[in-house]
Regions:
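Generic beta-strand/beta-sheet core signal
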Residues: 16-18, 36, 98-101, 107, ...
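Conserved helix-loop functional segments at active or binding sites
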Residues: 85-94, 115, 119-122, 162-165, ...
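CN hydrolase (nitrilase-like) catalytic-core segments centered on the catalytic cysteine
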Residues: 1-50
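Phosphate/ATP-binding catalytic cores across multiple sugar-kinase/actin-like superfamilies
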Residues: 75-97, 190-196
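ATP-dependent adenylation/pyrophosphate-handling site
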Residues: 94-100, 104-141
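A conserved beta-strand->alpha-helix junction
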Residues: 50-57, 121-126, 130, 134-180, ...
Length: 225
């Protein structure tokens, strides 16, 4: 409640906080959705642990919305760098490893890790599959060059094809061949990254984002390593 009010006052913009009601694995969501106006005053508060539907009218034209300032963005960056550096130090890790796909998420984690522990202590592993684009590999190589860290290429295509053949997943099946094949790729990458972590004493950094974590959009035993 206080956080929502603070954000509304800071940005001079109404904030609508919508929260799930119910249990999801080991997490219980309590609902209690709320709306704060541009002054930070709570103008609607839902009951906790009950489903709730309501309509609220807001003037979103005035005052003009204000985005996150550069100072706030810099504070977030500093917090993430400190978090990586401190976690590694307190758990006796001096080196890290991560999977680099060429996308924004893994690229951002790589940049933060290079700053936190030093580029010389970071290994970025590219693990192309039959579905990897040439652009993603090129982008990954360019990032590694800019950061000055070590890069490795560990293709998963051969292992992926063998597993599909062994489990007969390459042939049409009833409901779910594409999902199984997609998740197998992530899990194979997880095996490679954990092997490097164990063999070289490197901390494995996850490259998922908070949106994926919030809705559970990830592969168990793959992205969750």
């Amino acid at each position: 409640c206080d956080m929502v009010s603070h954000r509304a006052r800071l940005t001079k913009t109404p904030v609508i906080f919508v929260n799930l009601v119910g249990g999801n694995d080991g997490i219980i969501f309590d609902g209690a959705s709320l709306v704060a106006d541009e002054e930070g005053d709570i103008i609607l508060q839902a009951a906790a642990f009950e489903e709730f539907v309501e309509t609220v009218e807001l003037d979103v034209r005035k005052p003009d919305a204000r985005g996150i300032t550069g100072g706030e963005t810099e504070s977030i960056r500093q917090a993430l760098v400190l978090g990586i550096r401190d976690y590694a130090r307190k758990n006796s890790f001096t080196k890290c490893v991560l999977g680099l796909s060429g996308g924004i998420d893994s690229s951002l984690v790589a940049a933060l890790a290079a700053e936190a522990i030093g580029a010389e202590n970071l290994v970025c592993v590219m693990m192309p599959s039959p579905f990897s684009s040439e652009g993603s590999i090129k982008d990954s190589e360019e990032l590694v060059k800019n950061l000055g860290c070590e890069s490795r290429i560990e293709p998963i295509s051969a292992t992926f094809e063998v597993l599909l053949e062994q489990m007969n997943l390459h042939k049409p099946t009833k409901g779910g061949e594409s999902l199984a094949a997609e998740n197998i790729q992530s899990r194979l990458r997880g095996v490679i990254l954990m092997a490097i972590s164990n063999a070289e004493g490197r901390l494995l950094l996850s490259t998922g984002n908070k949106s994926e974590l919030a809705v559970g959009y990830c592969t168990l035993y793959g992205d969750t390593n």
